[in-house]
Amino acid sequence: MNKLFFVVFLCLIISVLAIGPADLGCTDMPQAEFDEKNANCEKCGNEEGFGEEMVSRCRDKCFTDNFYQSCVDLLNKVYEEKDVPVPPEE
């Protein structure tokens, strides 16, 4: 049973990692650009703790959706900088 679980889990990991531009309909996107954008989505979903749904939404519309830009902003700590209170000038 453990071997079967391991094989299924391994296939799942390989299928997630083996995604390419054509799989998302990004036929005009070079592989290097796709890999960079896909890595951003993976970081956003996994490192920020939002999970696979976040990764999927980030990839929507071949990374052209506003959700992708929000994910990049989150990784670049844009929101945290905006939320820091600025002391009043004297």
Swiss-Prot record:
It is found in: Secreted. GO terms for cellular component: extracellular region. Keywords: Secreted, Signal. Gene3D superfamilies: Crustacean CHH/MIH/GIH neurohormone (1.10.2010.10). Expressed by the venom gland. Residues 1-18 form the signal peptide. The keyword Transmembrane does not apply. Its main location: secreted. InterPro entries: Crust_neurohorm_sf. Belongs to the arthropod CHH/MIH/GIH/VIH hormone family. Co-purifies with alpha-latrotoxin. May increase the toxicity of alpha-latrotoxin and/or other venom components. Is non-toxic to mice and to the cockroach Periplaneta americana. This is Alpha-latrotoxin associated low molecular weight protein. It comes from Latrodectus geometricus.
